[in-house]
């Protein structure tokens, strides 16, 4: 998410689109990359807390100073800071989930140690349970996003999304072209079940919300043209459906050094067709490519598949969650069984976020999915898979464990314990 606004550079004059049809062709040609499956890239976001005062939000300068002193990360992850000060590790692609998990674990250990040296802790929860929303990242992109959400009547949800949510993102190869439709359909169909399994955000701003995944609830409060699922009724041509989705979505900002916000509703298609003029011109390929980074569907085509619907979950569980999702998509036998198991709940996004595994249909699907992964898990992930399987068997999401901790100790104490790594 932490991408800078950029403008076209070089001596050549950028070529502007002359129609939405031309823009659609550009999207379709670059949405998914034909090739084998097997590579896995992981990203994990963690809320940053002051160990002495969990109600205080560390400043941008403070976070920047800590990150500047982080030694080279052994797994090659990139460190970025989210709008509200959450710290993200973005790992490069590795061959298979085990290598990707091991690399991210190593990088997270180095990062946590440096933050702990500054009396700061990194907490894996889907939402910040304690502090009010507030932006600390001064980037022009995020200022423009704030203004867009305010103008569109979603200021509260927009602020929560930007400054109080965190996730584990799984990036997988798109695979061979002839399997794109089935693969993208399954990535969507797994969403509600995986949300129920990993739901880890029962609180926001100091209050229980009544939802297991408040993070997913926040995304649902934003406009579906920007944050809803990409696939339509059939899902037979994901590249074309992504193009339609992107062209219908409103432009959030004009891609310029100042990241000028667009505060009226202008679908990208209208800009490309000339029905609306932004920045005194029609859009270029750079404008379109940047527009795509402002769209946040649960499964986003980026030549690969960026799967965005998992809550940030504890260190003991996220390796198993990552392995489960990857296995259900990359192992053909597991994929076939998972598609059948999740069919009854394939569109139950809100129900999964609200009820988690207490919903019997989601629980049934979750049991099948986790068992499929556990049967294929390597010895290195046995402990994490055992914990995840036990949690699912007991119809408990990580949100239940955190809620119990809050009830027993209070919010601030519970957060402090997690920030210190006390389980």
Swiss-Prot record:
UniProt keyword list: ATP-binding, Ligase, Nucleotide-binding
Keyword ATP-binding carried by entry: yes
GO biological process, one term: glutathione biosynthetic process
A GO molecular-function annotation: glutamate-cysteine ligase activity
Pfam family, one: GCS2
PANTHER family per the UniProt record, alphabetical: GLUTAMATE--CYSTEINE LIGASE, CHLOROPLASTIC
Family: Belongs to the glutamate--cysteine ligase type 2 family. EgtA subfamily.
Name of the protein described by the UniProt record: Glutamate--cysteine ligase EgtA
Species this chain originates from: Mycolicibacterium smegmatis (strain ATCC 700084 / mc(2)155)
């Amino acid at each position: 998410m932490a991408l800078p606004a950029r403008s076209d550079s070089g001596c050549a004059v950028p070529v502007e689109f002359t129609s939405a049809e031309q823009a659609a062709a550009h999207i379709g040609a670059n949405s998914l990359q034909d090739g084998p499956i097997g590579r896995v890239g992981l990203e994990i976001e963690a809320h940053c807390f002051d160990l002495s005062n969990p109600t205080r939000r560390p400043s941008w300068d403070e976070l920047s100073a800590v990150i500047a002193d982080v030694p080279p990360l052994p797994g090659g992850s990139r460190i970025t800071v989210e709008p509200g000060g959450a710290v993200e590790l973005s790992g490069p692609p590795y061959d298979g989930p085990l290598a990707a998990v091991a690399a991210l674990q190593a990088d997270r250990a180095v990062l946590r140690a440096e933050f702990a040296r500054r009396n700061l802790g990194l907490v894996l929860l889907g939402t910040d349970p304690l502090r009010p929303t507030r932006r600390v990242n001064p980037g022009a992109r995020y200022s423009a996003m704030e203004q867009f959400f305010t103008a569109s009547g979603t200021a509260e949800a927009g602020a929560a999304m930007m400054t109080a949510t965190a996730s584990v993102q799984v990036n997988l190869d798109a695979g061979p072209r002839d399997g794109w439709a089935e693969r993208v359909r399954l990535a969507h169909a797994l969403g509600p079940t995986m949300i129920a399994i990993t739901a880890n955000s029962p609180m926001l701003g100091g209050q229980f919300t009544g939802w297991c995944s408040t993070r997913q609830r926040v995304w649902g409060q934003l406009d579906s043209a920007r944050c809803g699922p990409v696939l339509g009724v059939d899902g037979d041509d994901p590249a074309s459906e992504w193009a339609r989705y992107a062209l219908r979505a409103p432009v959030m900002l004009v891609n310029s050094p100042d990241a000028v916000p667009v505060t009226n509703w202008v679908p990208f298609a209208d800009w490309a067709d000339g029905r609306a003029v932004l920045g005194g011109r029609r859009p270029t390929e750079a404008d379109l490519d940047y527009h795509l980074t402002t769209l946040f569907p649960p499964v986003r085509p980026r030549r690969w598949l960026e799967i965005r619907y998992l809550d940030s979950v504890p260190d003991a569980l996220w390796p198993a969650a990552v392995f489960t999702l990857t296995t259900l998509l990359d192992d053909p036998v597991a994929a076939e069984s998972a598609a059948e198991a999740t069919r009854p709940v394939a569109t139950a996004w809100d129900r999964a976020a609200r009820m988690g595994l207490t919903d019997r249909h989601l629980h049934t699907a979750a049991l099948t999915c986790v068992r499929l992964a556990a049967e294929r898990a390597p010895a290195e992930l046995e402990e994490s898979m055992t914990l995840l399987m036990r949690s699912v068997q007991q119809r408990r999401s990580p949100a239940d464990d955190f809620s119990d901790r809050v009830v027993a100790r209070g919010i601030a104490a519970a957060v402090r314990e997690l920030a210190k790594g006390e389980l």
